[in-house]
Amino acid sequence: MKGNQEEYRLKFFLDHDYLRRECKVCKTPFWSKDKTREDCADIPCSDYYFLDMKESNLNWSVSEARRRFLDFFRRNGHEIIPPKPVLARWREDLYLTIASIVDFQPYITSGISPPPANPLVVSQPCIRMDDVDNVGITFGRHLTTFEMGGHHAFNYPDKFLYWKDETVAYAKEFFTKEMGIPEELLNFKESWWEGGGNAGPSFEVTVGGLELATLVFMQYEIRDGEYVPLKLKIVDTGYGIERLAWFTQKTPTAFHAIYGELVDKFLEKLGLPSLNPDMLKVASRFAGRIDPDVPSTIQGHREQVAKAMGLPVKEVSEELTRAARVFQVLDHTKTIALMLGDGLVPSSGGEGYLGRLLIRRALRTLKLLNVDVRLSELVDMQIGFWGKDFTQLVRNRDYILDAVNLEQEKFNEILNRMSSVVSSLTKKKEIGVEDLIQLYDSQGIPPDLMAEEMRSKGLKVEVPHNFYSIVAKRHQSAPVKKEWDTTKLPPEVVKQVKDLPPTEKLYYKDQYARNFEGVIVKSLGKYLVLDRTVFYPEGGGQLGDQGWLLLDGQRVKVVDTQKVGDVVVHVLEREISAKEGDKVKGEIDWVRRFRMMRHHTGTHVVLAAAKKLLGDHVWQAGAEKTPEKARLDITHHRNLTREEVKRIEEMANLVVDDRRPVTPFEINRTEAETKYGVSIYEGGVPNKAVIRLLEIKDWDVESCGGTHVANTADIGGIKIVNVEKIQDGIIRLEYVAGDVISSYAGNLEDKLEGLASKLETSTSQIESRVEKLKEENERMKELIAFYRRQYLDDLEKHVETRNVGKVKIVILPSLKDEDLEREAMRRLTSTQGVVVIHVNQVNGKLQIEIGTSKDLNVSTVVTELVKAGGKGGGRGTFGSVMIEKGTKEEVIDIVERAIKGGNS
């Protein structure tokens, strides 16, 4: 285990004359055939001297590196499997796919489910936001998106495939035979890996300063601080596909190797001059010495580059800053395309928060570059460049670009209100990190764009260099609750039933069953557990069944049904005296249940219709099925139009009319994911090896544990009754099905009758009556406007005024109309040298509003009123003050004194 040298002393190393040495810089042991090597050939112990190596003369693009990697392991007995999306929707605890092993967590790695192949190989696009602030400044060491080439072997006690020696041998074979790297240049640096509750020894494969792969051997579970050997031992490797490309191309930076011609195309689109390749190559060579958490190392790096180039530090610093920002835009736009292409909808929570964060960081970088380019144009260039590798980008192009455009519009609105937000903070002397995070979360304003304006207003503020990384880490994972954390049952009941045998679920054997007989397993007052039941417990957004139980001649109402794990608990309306082993007859409220079955199946139909109409980004964000109606929350970036709602409803009802079979079935989760993809988890991720899917023929397949009709015809029709945006990026659809449509229509008719009565017309004439009332209303508005103008003209002639020097004080009377008072204030202050005061009694206090012409300033008057005991403020030409006690004349006297005492 950790610290045990024998974990790393492999037969392969001994048989192939590798020596175990200790790095003279970091003191980490490593294995190499080079007897003269003194360091581990990894940064910061070594520079990126691979850039000057001549040993490997390949020129792989990222696509070619991926192909070569996959093909090598295919030839060596590994099955190639397709990558999963960058959104980890098969995980409830994680938003983004951060490594290839995530594809198999937690069910395959824990041994609950079999892997899709064994051994296997995958090139998995990954997204990590932990180091987002470091992108660009390390010239390729940090990326938000990268491909992890992973060959994996799952070693079971009865089926052991290969382990450490073979894994290291594969690495040696790949790097020497496929890439042409002399074996003497390979270094296997000893390390230790921990993550997700597992641990194991690992090797980092380094060549010329660049880490090309990590070989992890998951063999322990961390339990109470102890390392407990796992029965399932997993080979978990990560080859950096982009790094393989950079190693072979030896371009000035990793970004040149990854993006090729796109670098110059971006510069052209941004209207920026070409980058200095010689300077960038020197900068990359020394980039390993940069520790972004120590800002002084960045300055030291630039001084080193300047010295090597014989150039002024200022010139080098400006050029490298510009290059880093261009690289940030390159990196972020690809990641944005991948996120949105896999269905992310930018929002203020969950995975959408991370997408919005990256979009806003890209927009902020464009502002810092002082360029006026739509971000969507740059994202579109990424789609064109990567479309063959990631076909979902092309398929979802329209959505991706529309969503990015909408986010840029929102960002511009945010910047427009930045000044007012900063002004509201002037009472604070210092703005801390938590303040900045709160401001970013609530207002969306990038702190580095705010900082300059904050400082100009006397605020002390320091923006952390890793601000976005701090924020991203807080939002990168989701809290996961145990099933019984969300139950409505009392804790003492949960405690007593959670270890009982599973209840036989008759509602799955026959979803149309209404009656049953069972035996009491546990009786806890008004909580009853039976050995079997047709009562469906609340779950998946469907309410628990109600009905009746008959025992000892008593008919007791069941008011709710809940579950704890696989144990179903019947909640009775009153406590009963019953013994374990007693027989019980049960009957569900069938009318109620059947309505929920219709609504539940209808939800699957509506969700699939919305996804087919609006795009792959539509994902279920919540649902509820009650007897009265159903609701479905979906992710979507815009409000739905009336036409879109009508089309979703039409598509759903066509499925109802098609009389499609609705079939529930059980399947191994690995097989289900392979066959149907992770979209089966729209309604949540079940915690089982074998999962229950619901298939609506040729329409939808989704994991679901609810009760459903047997044929879409049984839904009886679907009517969408309400659509609203409930939060940023979430649209709620409410609808009714079957006989509830008739009730809904009846309620509408009652409302129409009531409306007709109020309008003194018939229901058939409501529309024409409303049109007539609208016309009358417009005429009244015109008439009122005419009388307002006349009144104001007359007011200007007769309003009370007082002169103080060259300033005229106008005392505006109460007009009992706020709009009229505002218009009067505007007109009266339109000429120079005017101060208007309006005094109103509000709950025994004096509410004073002051307006001045543009040549005067309201602050002097406001200051005097505050000195006199008032509370309020003002700036420019308007102020407002509240005084507890006083008279109108006293207020006028204060205003006169203020004007006499100085310019108002």
Curated annotation (Swiss-Prot):
Q: Which SMART domains match?
A: tRNA_SAD
Which named protein is this? Alanine--tRNA ligase
Molecular function terms, GO-annotated? alanine-tRNA ligase activity; aminoacyl-tRNA deacylase activity; ATP binding; tRNA binding; zinc ion binding
User: Taking the first listed entry, what is the main subcellular location of this protein, grouped into a coarse class?
Assistant: cytoplasm
- Describe cofactor binding as the record notes it: Binds 1 zinc ion per subunit.
Q: What role is this protein assigned?
A: Catalyzes the attachment of alanine to tRNA(Ala) in a two-step reaction: alanine is first activated by ATP to form Ala-AMP and then transferred to the acceptor end of tRNA(Ala). Also edits incorrectly charged Ser-tRNA(Ala) and Gly-tRNA(Ala) via its editing domain.
Q: Which family does it belong to?
A: Belongs to the class-II aminoacyl-tRNA synthetase family.
What species was this sequence derived from?
Answer: Metallosphaera sedula (strain ATCC 51363 / DSM 5348 / JCM 9185 / NBRC 15509 / TH2)
- Which BP terms in the Gene Ontology apply to this protein? alanyl-tRNA aminoacylation
Q: Which UniProt keywords apply?
A: Aminoacyl-tRNA synthetase, ATP-binding, Cytoplasm, Ligase, Metal-binding, Nucleotide-binding, Protein biosynthesis, RNA-binding, tRNA-binding, Zinc
PANTHER family, from UniProt?
ALANINE--TRNA LIGASE, CYTOPLASMIC, ALANYL-TRNA SYNTHETASE
